[in-house]
Amino acid sequence: MEIRERDGLARIARFDTPHGTIETPTVLPVINPNIMDITPEEMKKYGVHGVITNSYIILRNDRLREEAEKYGVHSLIGYDGPVMTDSGTFQSYVYGSVEFNNRQVVEFQKTIGSDILTILDIFTTPSSSRQEVENAITETYRRMLEVNDAGGMIAGPIQGGIYPDLRKRSAELMNSTNASYLPIGGVVPLLESYEYDKLVDIILNSKLNVSFGKPIHLFGGGHPMFFAFAVYLGVDLFDSASYVKYAKDDRLIYPDGTRDLARIIEIPEWSPLFDKYTVKELKELPKEQRSVELSRHNLKAIFMEISEIRERIYEESMDQYLAQKAKSHPSLLKAYVKVMQYSKMLEKYQDLFKKAAYFFYDSFSTKNTYVARLEKFTSKYLTSKKKETYVFSRKDWLPGYTNLNFVRDVYERTECNALIPWSGIMVPAELENTYPIEQTVSSGLEPDPDVSAISESISPFDIRVYKGESVDSDKIRSFDLEKIRTIADYQFGYGIGKDFFKDDVRIFKSKTGRIRGVFDKGNKLIATLRNDGFFTLTFHGATLLYNVSKSPNLRVFVKNESAEYNAKGYSVFFKFILDADPDIIAKNETLVVNENGELVAVGKATVSGKELREYSDGIAVKIHEGRDQSAK
């Protein structure tokens, strides 16, 4: 997988097949080689990058098998793009068995030129017992090993039923094989019964236990209603027969659900049927023709949602989109609550900042990944200092509107902490300009922060509600200096700030009072303090950070052949990475180190630390200053 854009676990990526590149997220429409009312060639205009067809159907039909063996599956279905073939697993589940074994099915898929082959795995359902699921995992793993040397791109399905630990085990087993494409199987019954909250558990326990370099496919997840949730959790591909199945039942797919033809009075403007029929004319069409036309509508709805999701990833607004989608159906809201329960786990994959503003909608927004990150930092901020803490109401200190009276009369004359309200929690006042604290667009429905919650970190006797008082003593510290130190603690690791910004650094501010530059003995430490409130380091600043931080913190270790170019300002590519700090946050400043342990450049990580070690294609770190550039 080559990653192009990302927003947390959601990504726009691409991978190559013998018949072309597939760009994700996307849907592979299911093609029945016996009945192709909409040809794969026609599907291209809807945004189709690849299709999936069933090798078992082809194998058991003499005419189809002979044609596929002679001319290939691409010729059989009339499509020159990437073709994935399924193995007959679902048919085995429905009918009890199939007449071909795993090796025969895989060899046949190779023979007919499939781009992505699928093993004959063991299907399990949500009602399968734990023992049945364990047996299925073991047998599926054995079958994968049986064809491990088959060559090409092989799909190794992840099973595990509704048991998160078994999903994890299956994912780890499949990841250890030559399977380079990982579908999540056994989920269709959950999708059909709208049990989306269980799918959240299944997807995350699969996704987070395999390599980020492998595509993740949600087998059977063909309705757009759940696409955004699945992509948010790391799914790259879906397959869909629903566009045809629903059409045969006179049902129209919309991005937020399904509607019966008998109950609609308008054809939406985005539908390919809008200028072609009235609703009355559509209802009066012969059944077979009507099904074909409704299939076109359904296909358009599916890919319209995929297009919107891709745009949201590019905008880095998937959090907002998920919050909006959650209110479209009670089952999605239940799934959203489940996603929020994973916020602490997902936080490490969340960017340091985003292009899009942070939207606060309601109480659910208090469970966001950024809230989890800031709560964790605030706890460290309080427990490490353990001193008098002033708390503010929204009317006394809003992010970006510093309470200068407090700074002058109290903060700079004491060693106190200061906490301001944001999204229903209290955060350090020194972080007021950092993302997402200042970059929040709020509904105004934030709950008042529970001040008693911070009593877990400090004594309740040390908490003060600011009421305009003043301390009668001399100035003993600078708010600006403490601000940049706290930002450094948040951005680079707690405790770094004081070592990085010594007492004698010079701070330069804009006419509006914003900190814009920091110098150490005439050397610029930060190239800029951006609108997101975080630091972009110069190479001199990176050198100081390298000296005051412990390896492997914030470091990416690269081959010397790459380091030579990185020192000149060229980006780091994934394929040259030897190792990386697993705790690196996407978009944070990253120290590029050669095989000798020498700092050669500083740049911005494009992905998280775990991802840095697992992708093989694309840009890993965008360099903004190399050692050789600094020396000029």
From Swiss-Prot:
This is tRNA-guanine(15) transglycosylase. GO terms for molecular function: pentosyltransferase activity; RNA binding; zinc ion binding. Exchanges the guanine residue with 7-cyano-7-deazaguanine (preQ0) at position 15 in the dihydrouridine loop (D-loop) of archaeal tRNAs. Binds 1 zinc ion per subunit. Belongs to the archaeosine tRNA-ribosyltransferase family. Keywords: Glycosyltransferase, Metal-binding, Transferase, tRNA processing, Zinc. The lineage of its organism: Archaea, Methanobacteriati, Thermoplasmatota, Thermoplasmata, Thermoplasmatales. PANTHER family: QUEUINE TRNA-RIBOSYLTRANSFERASE. Residues 553-628 form the PUA domain. Substrate binds at D121, G186. The keyword GTP-binding does not apply.
